């Protein structure tokens, strides 16, 4: 299964250039960026032109958000955490990884920075917004514990139907996963994965289908997901347990839901920017963070 891209803040090198050029102007004579027959482009020329780009304010906002988050919570996100997430994507996409980066407008370094921004945002959310007992009880009503399944992802429905027929004929699920699954991250281990109800990388249709299965059962019809069709077999579906013993998992589930809520995350980022005293000095770019100053819709 391909992970859903949920990169909240995209960082662009143009924003870096914008601030660097701004600093150069205040510290030294106007330098040449380029020359041509009959003229030249100076740093001030380029800076002025750059500010007219429709995306410049967005890129500046993203850069400031990242720096504010990193200053406030950088010690809470290790390089290993970012590298592990990066390697997970790299393994998942295999030889298509560079194409994945290109399609989403990333270099390898900017993708790592975006992953770090995601982790920093999650830390900020947990620091600035707490989960109440009533919210935990609401989640408990539909909570599911960590389950382990095997799955086979196919690109078309007919292949998934054939897999189900092969299983009915007595063929081994793990063997079929190795030959028929297109999920390079799990096919070699028989398609085995474990997940909790707060998992953000799996389609809801996948999780819903899995939760309906008893140990040893598999889906009798293909399950449609974002990037194909799934056949799922339940390996371990434990009992729900008690509310008290599940509080940690319930809290994680609430935070996972909040992290996907743009209005909640807007308020969190707004508070981070306020706490870090972020101010834009250039009057032409002064409104770059205005969307974080407006009240977000309450959920």
From Swiss-Prot:
Lipidation feature positions (N-palmitoyl cysteine): 24
Enzymatic reactions: [protein]-peptidylproline (omega=180) = [protein]-peptidylproline (omega=0)
UniProt GO molecular function: peptidyl-prolyl cis-trans isomerase activity
GO cellular component, one term: plasma membrane
Signal peptide: 1-23
Domain (PpiC): residue spans on this chain: 144-236
Family: Belongs to the PrsA family.
Protein name: Foldase protein PrsA
